């Protein structure tokens, strides 16, 4: 993902996923692409931005907290979360924020 997500006027929500990866891929890239595709089909999904240079940061944008809750409990996403804990990440943190203002150029 190399583009900046097009989001509506605030308010909306951001889920910020920060991670450190373990060595090796072991299916990570395929699962990551699958999760972006699947998330984009979820009600309330607005967009996603991602970058990795040592530490990885993925920010997904959502219309409301209920949509985030539904995404977190999606069966395929639950499997990806489990695999992430078992083999892909040495550590991670998820934060959820309400976006009150945004600016762009």
Which residues make up each language-model segment?
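C-terminal structural segments of small proteins and small subunits
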Residues: 80-87
